[in-house]
Amino acid sequence: MVTANLRFVVKVAYEYRSYGIKMSDLIQEGNIGLMKAVQKFDPDKGIRLISYAVWWIRAYIQNYILKSWSLVKLGTTQAHGKLFFSLARTRRELEKFGSGDAAVNVDDIARRLHVKPGEVREMEQRMGGRDLSLDAPMGEDGGNSHVDFVVSAAAPQDDEFADKEEAGLINARVRAALMRLDPREPFIIEQRVMNERPMTLKELGEHFGFSRERARQLEIRAKDKLKSELAALMAEVDPEAVAAQQ
């Protein structure tokens, strides 16, 4: 199963080519994520392998990028990771609808990404300024530096890519976590949360043959377990980052 999906790993890795990391390294990390997914994959859950594996592939690649950029202290928590990959897009969204006050925008960005305003300012300086670590040559040939590969804030196509990237990653994470739940719990989550036309508690109870109140209790339990499994997935990919958040 690993060999059959190697080309997909290359495709995903190519999406991260702008971060100044060798493609061979990105592909290698993606392959590790794929192997992890294959080890944990359960075909009886009714989810396609590639839908499950994409979360692991992206998670390992993103984690590697963050660690590669750690020489400029970008941060290792999940919130810092989101800040790194979403800062430029989030700022443009807020400036588009705001007053143009940079201080207000920084506070808004910090609230949206669950970090401190000072962390936003520091990240912007490190990603967009002339930081010595970013300007250092990446290879022995003294050619490109890390800053040369940072996504340009002026590129409009990056907005669409970032939106799809974040939505796809969230969906893949949820799908991966759903596979860890008891057999009927994924159905409850999908029917009550993920469907465009959610089942009512009464309909859910009738489907399984129990009361509306019992359906409500099972929904709460399924949601709590899903949150726990999502946290566990993050810990498996990068336990240091999860520990830093606690």
Curated annotation (Swiss-Prot):
Pfam families linked: Sigma70_r2, Sigma70_r4
NCBIfam families: PRK06596.1, sigma70-ECF
The entry's keywords: DNA-binding, Sigma factor, Transcription, Transcription regulation
InterPro entries, sorted: RNA_pol_sigma-70_dom (IPR014284), RNA_pol_sigma70 (IPR000943), RNA_pol_sigma70_r2 (IPR007627), RNA_pol_sigma70_r4 (IPR007630), RNA_pol_sigma_r2 (IPR013325), RNA_pol_sigma_r3/r4-like (IPR013324), Sigma-70_Factor (IPR050813)
A biological process term (GO) from this entry: DNA-templated transcription initiation
Motif Polymerase core binding, chain ranges: 25-38
Keyword Transcription appears in the UniProt entry: yes
Record-linked PANTHER family: RNA POLYMERASE SIGMA FACTOR RPOH (PTHR30376:SF3), SIGMA FACTOR RPOH HEAT SHOCK RELATED (PTHR30376)
Protein name, UniProt field: RNA polymerase sigma-B factor
Highest taxon of source: Bacteria
The protein's role, per its UniProt record: Sigma factors are initiation factors that promote the attachment of RNA polymerase to specific initiation sites and are then released. This sigma factor is essential for late-stage differentiation of M.xanthus.
Naturally occurring in which organism (per UniProt): Myxococcus xanthus
Family per similarity comment: Belongs to the sigma-70 factor family.
DNA-binding positions: 201-220
Gene Ontology molecular-function annotations: DNA binding; sigma factor activity
